[in-house]
Amino acid sequence: MIIAIGCAAGRIMSTLGLPFAAINTDWRELENCAADSKLPISEFGLGAGANPVIGAQAAEDAAEAIATLCMESVLLVAGLGGGTGTGTAPVVARIARAQGCEVTAVVTWPFPFESRRWAQQARRGLTALQAYVPRIVVVKLRELLPLPPATRLRDVFEMADHKAASAVMDTLRGP
């Protein structure tokens, strides 16, 4: 089962046309996601406000529902740095491992221009994820830089989604 966690992962997986489940604290983003199964978490559905603690707590509160998504082998897809992907992914990984699932992850690392705070949160999120996931593919978005000066921000993030989608496909194909 592929589980996309957060806004970035939902966008990434929606480009691939593969079956997947999506978990998000932002219910509007979840609604627009192409997932086969959608699990809204959080009390109000307004996102985690770039706060991983809120993302983690929302996942803890939804642990039973998350467990129903975890079968045999789980591929987690998440963007690190913000609140939902960073905070929720380690909780989902822990739940999946507790059920005996083999867990792999593909995560994106923030662009250098996204902020020092996002880089720090990404580092902490990756460390938390490593406790439960033996194989993590980190897609470093800085590898897309430098960009032509006239590149729109929307296009930059679209390129990032495609780079991450390629990593997901490579991971599914195996070594």
Regions found by a protein language model. Give the residues of each.
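Tubulin/FtsZ superfamily GTPase core signature
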Residues: 1-175
